[in-house]
Amino acid sequence: LNRSVKIKQVVDALEHYAPLPLQEGYDNAGLQVGLTEAVEMSGALLCLDVTEAVVDEAIRKGCNLIVSHHPLIFRKLARISDENYVQRTVRKAIKNDITIVAMHTNMDAAAGGVNFKIAEKLGLRNVQFFAGEKEVDGVKGGEGVIGEVAEDLAADDLVLMLKERFGVECVQCNQLLRRPIRKVALCGGAGAFLLDAAIKAGADAFITGEMSYHEYFCHEQEIQICVIGHYQSEQFTGEIFRSIIQENFPDAKCCISEINTNPILYL
């Protein structure tokens, strides 16, 4: 028996797991497009970014809810026309009665959120926050996590593990660390702001999605920097959304998007 689930119930479950007040001040997580109150959910499509192709996929799969990591509407929209992909995507969603919700820096910060998922993929133990700790509605939050590998790794073996588990062909690193790596700190997406905190926390390695040129300097033999790509670092976020929805609504239809929305090609 498929008991009907309202979109609002699903959104509430997601926000209970990662309360919106955990988000950064600059962010626009939460409802992006559409209605939640009285609408029954036909299915949820889970993704990292919402593009027109993702809305088409939702239509094809009979999903009237899209849950994304990155907000579709980040900067204020001056108008809704067809000048750029955001406007076109908003129009397409509205025309097809699709509701779009984003769980961004609130899901980055939440216990069991994006960074914990990355740590899980790396098999880290004793995973805990090492910076920016706070608590909202009984949910603990923080800016980055640190944990220990099961057994000490050489730097090149850590790089190999990242390539395998995150499906990347290239990892941007500073000079390879000559001591074994035990403590690993990480932050999905753009995490360079946590590099100093990672060093202070005693990390042997710091893994993130993107860093700029000058941020790599002056850390030789102090910490191993591994940068795997913004999209690549957060690619498993849909699995978090899926487990929250399945746990609360076992009969609800939810599927992870098959579209790779990474705009960066590695050629």
Predicted ranges, named:
Residues 1-267:
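Hydrophobic structural segments
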